[in-house]
Amino acid sequence: MDSQARIQANLRHIQAFEAKPNPKALPETAVTRGFEKVAFPKLVRELTCDNAVVRKKSLLAARELLSSPVNHVQCVAAGATPAIVALLQDQTDDETRYYAAGTLKLLAAKEVGARDLAQHSGLDALAAALEDPSEGVRDEAYGALIEAARFDSTRRALEACGSGAVLPRLMELALLEAQGGAAGRAQQGLVLLFTCTQARHNAGILSQLVDVAQAIPHLAGLLKPELPMPVRHAAAELLGALATREDAKIQAVQVGAVPLLLLAASPSVPVPFATSAVAALGAITIRREGKYAALESPGGLAGLVSVLDPCHEQLCINAMTAVSNVAEAPEARAILVASGAGPKLQHIFETATVEVVKRAAAQAIRQCRFKHLPYEVLPGAPPINEE
């Protein structure tokens, strides 16, 4: 091949690689990845654009970024929270609200996101979304609030929301969901309220629920055997938290909560539900009224004895606490002994390897054997006259 032919072949080779069509323009609704720090302002820009399809895609993109701790902080710093909260209030599109509520659940997974959510009225927006016509939006809103309420700052913010009207309204909504057959959302509502009661300073929250919402009689109604187990479990858990107040203990006895709780003191009941119910009994039976309500419930004390099983440690501790409380009533001690409490407690005391279980068993043994003052020496403790 002469030089001219080689030149022509080379030109054809170059033309073959140069003759490419221009890249096609992307459609208006295409969402492309932004790299490094460009991604976060771009995300906020797309969340606030005029195109509904782009906004939905941006909400899904935000979930991907929020799943990374480093990116989570940068999303918050870029201003994603108010943009997502605004989309949660978009009354024109159920799907947008659904995506927004689910994205806020991821945002609230970290305390920095939960705090930012509270600062931009996100908690009020989520509380309003609990009454959304779309069931999917309500489900996601409950999930987001439960996630945010893991932090004490959010619990305090929820207490103050709506001038103190949000938590009582949550109690009403939980009842409405239970009556409507939506057991899952009713349970979520009760779990959210229980989480709020775990605030470091919870006197205001308890007051809103006990005094304003009149939660005690409602919770007693939710303990009825015909209701779904998850609802009864969540109701027992919340009742135990509210029963830290003395007037709530008395009210729980008056509305008949004690016999309903004792129904859960059985080996046939799922352990988590039994654990919560017996814990609530332990709180209520501190009062004299609670002791005699348990004593007068048919088969109630035998039920407590039946769950004295060290295989389920927390349930066993709760049951021994309740037994110790009830045994302060003289009439209860004979019934407990007849139900076989003595040998069970002694076995737990002798075989326990955890100090808190051993101490709870010792307290229950001493209380069941009590005849007169002064108290006998606690089992396992050294004699009083020893140095």
Swiss-Prot record:
<dbReference type="InterPro" id="IPR000225">
    <property type="entry name" value="Armadillo"/>
</dbReference>
<feature type="repeat" description="ARM 5">
    <location>
        <begin position="204"/>
        <end position="244"/>
    </location>
</feature>
<dbReference type="InterPro" id="IPR016024">
    <property type="entry name" value="ARM-type_fold"/>
</dbReference>
<feature type="repeat" description="ARM 3">
    <location>
        <begin position="111"/>
        <end position="150"/>
    </location>
</feature>
<comment type="similarity">
    <text>Belongs to the flagellar radial spoke RSP14 family.</text>
</comment>
<keyword id="KW-0963">Cytoplasm</keyword>
<feature type="repeat" description="ARM 1">
    <location>
        <begin position="24"/>
        <end position="67"/>
    </location>
</feature>
<dbReference type="InterPro" id="IPR011989">
    <property type="entry name" value="ARM-like"/>
</dbReference>
<feature type="repeat" description="ARM 7">
    <location>
        <begin position="289"/>
        <end position="328"/>
    </location>
</feature>
<feature type="repeat" description="ARM 6">
    <location>
        <begin position="245"/>
        <end position="286"/>
    </location>
</feature>
<keyword id="KW-0282">Flagellum</keyword>
<feature type="repeat" description="ARM 8">
    <location>
        <begin position="330"/>
        <end position="370"/>
    </location>
</feature>
<dbReference type="GO" id="GO:0031514">
    <property type="term" value="C:motile cilium"/>
</dbReference>
<dbReference type="GO" id="GO:0005856">
    <property type="term" value="C:cytoskeleton"/>
</dbReference>
<dbReference type="InterPro" id="IPR042856">
    <property type="entry name" value="RSP14"/>
</dbReference>
<keyword id="KW-0206">Cytoskeleton</keyword>
<keyword id="KW-0677">Repeat</keyword>
<keyword id="KW-0966">Cell projection</keyword>
<protein>
    <recommendedName>
        <fullName>Radial spoke protein 14</fullName>
    </recommendedName>
</protein>
<dbReference type="GO" id="GO:0005737">
    <property type="term" value="C:cytoplasm"/>
</dbReference>
<feature type="repeat" description="ARM 4">
    <location>
        <begin position="154"/>
        <end position="198"/>
    </location>
</feature>
<feature type="repeat" description="ARM 2">
    <location>
        <begin position="69"/>
        <end position="109"/>
    </location>
</feature>
<keyword id="KW-0969">Cilium</keyword>
